[in-house]
Amino acid sequence: MIFNKADFIASYGISSLLPESDRPELSFSGRSNVGKSSLINKLCSRKNLARVSSTPGKTATINFYSVDDCYFVDLPGYGYAKVSNADRERWDDLINSYFEAPRHHTLLVQLLDCRHAPSADDLQMLRYLHYHRIPYVVALTKADKLKKSQLAKTQEDFENICRPYGCQKVVLTSGENGYGIPELQAVLNAAVAAENEEAE
C-alpha cells in the first residue's frame, strides 16, 4: 500500500457510533498541536485530508479515514490546559471505549515533539499503552526544526526513554518536508501486511 486512496469518513464523539471494525486500524495519538493532522496528510500525500486545527484541545472526537485497505484513526489530542474536567473525562471514556472494544487494533502511532522531553501526559499515555499491551511505535514530529547534527542524538535519547514502555520503534518525521515519512510508511505497511496474514 502507498496510502494514496484516502477519504475522510466521519468524526465520532460517542464510541457506540464508531463504524464496524472490518479491516486493520492504524491509530494516531498525541498531545494537542503535536502535528497529528500534518503527519496524516503527509503519509497520504494530501494537503487537506486531516484538517489542521487552530484551536487545540477543542476536538473531542475520533476521526476515521478510509485509507486503501485499512482505517487511519485519529484519536483526540490530550494535554490542553484549558479543557474542562468534564471534557477530559469524556475524552478518557471515548479512548478507553475505543481500545477496549474488539476491534482490529493493528498499530498505534504515538506522536511526540522531538524538540522537547515527553510531558507528564505523554508519559502517562506511554504507560497506558504498555499496560494494555497496545502495539505502538513513536513518531517524533517536527524534525525539520532540528539541525542535521542533532537528529541521531535526538532519536537515541527518545529510544532510551520509550523502550521501557514497550515501544517497538522510534521514527523521526516531519509533516513539513517529509523527513522520515517513507520509513514510517514502511512500518505501517508491514503492520497491516502482518495483520492480513493472520486473518487468512
Model-derived features with residue positions:
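Glycine-rich, phosphate-binding/catalytic loops in enzymes
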Residues: 45-46, 88-91, 125-128, 154-157, ...
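Conserved C-terminal guanine-recognition region of P-loop GTPase G domains, centered on the G4
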Residues: 96-168
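Conserved nucleotide-binding/hydrolysis micro-motifs of P-loop NTPases
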Residues: 58, 70, 77-80, 115-117, ...
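Switch II of P-loop NTPase G domains
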Residues: 18, 54-63, 76-106, 114-128
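Hydrophobic packing within well-folded, soluble alpha/beta domains
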Residues: 39, 108-109, 184
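Conserved amphipathic alpha-helical interaction elements at protein-protein interfaces in regulatory
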Residues: 45-49, 101, 131, 164, ...
